């Protein structure tokens, strides 16, 4: 999502240990370059803050869908945290994930479930405080049996 709340949440993760934050423009190449260092890392692909008001969510959502299709398989990711309806739809569609078996609400207003063995969480782009994405990443790690520092 390009909503200011989501951009604030992405900024909260920048520079924190265990997180790799990529801007959309160079994400596929940068992720491929860093792939050997990414296992156990939360990878966030963020929309650029500048220009966010001039390009529709749909444009960024489609681009994220294409990026997910390019890099998701090689990363063998265990979870997806998707922000914004257009983003969620585009990424899930690009990955061929059609059904999510919902089972939890890790934060108020955030749906979580499983799609073909992948933990999927979706939230509105404008929802949550600055620590929301971090809290969801910690939740995902616990569900996947990965020990992560919760701070």
Each model region followed by its residue ranges:
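Active-site catalytic microenvironments in core metabolic enzymes, especially phosphate/sugar-handling
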Residues: 1-151
């Amino acid at each position: 999502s390009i909503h200011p709340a989501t951009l604030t949440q992405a900024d909260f993760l920048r520079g924190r240990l265990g997180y790799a934050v990529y801007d959309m423009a160079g994400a596929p190449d940068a992720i491929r370059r860093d792939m050997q260092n990414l296992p156990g890392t939360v990878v966030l692909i963020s929309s650029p803050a500048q220009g966010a008001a001039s390009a529709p969510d749909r444009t960024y959502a489609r681009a994220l869908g294409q990026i997910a299709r390019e890099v998701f398989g090689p990363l063998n990711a265990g979870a997806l945290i998707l922000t914004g309806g257009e983003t969620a739809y585009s990424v899930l569609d690009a990955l061929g994930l059609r059904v999510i078996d919902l089972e939890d609400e890790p934060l108020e207003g955030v749906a979580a479930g499983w799609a073909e063995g992948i933990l999927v969480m979706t939230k509105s782009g404008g929802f949550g405080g600055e620590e929301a994405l971090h809290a969801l990443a910690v939740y995902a790690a616990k569900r996947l049996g990965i020990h992560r520092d919760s701070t």
